[in-house]
Amino acid sequence: MLDFNKIKEVAQGYQADMTAFLRAIVKNPGESCDEKAHVETIAAEMKKLDFDEVVIDPQGNVIGYMGTGDKIIAFDGHIDTVGIGNINNWTFDPYDGYENETEIGGRGVSDQCGGVVSAVYGAKIMKDYNLIPEGYK
């Protein structure tokens, strides 16, 4: 098993990729019942990261698997957002967002697309470093 500091170091190496992935999700509106662009962006990233299986179910959920066992380790997160309201109330384009050394802003970044991005890359790190227990996916 890797120690936490090594895992953190590996994760920091993906910071630019994770930031680009999050910004790609945010670029598209994703209001409830209209998240198709978010789903497709997440599925494409999972495939790029060599998930063992990527499924978009009939309800439009994207499900990615790392590992091939019968037991499941799951992270569940929503990717829909609320509307932007009056665009004139924003100090930046909520779909273009902004980024500086410490923050990324945009519609859905903190609720909850950023968490989904972290989970996708967390699964990649788990697979790359053999941290998925035998019998799990």
Label every model-predicted segment:
Residues 112-137:
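Acidic/histidine-rich catalytic neighborhood of metal-dependent amide-processing enzymes
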Residues 2-109, 128-133:
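Acidic/His- and Gly-rich active-site-bordering loop/insert found
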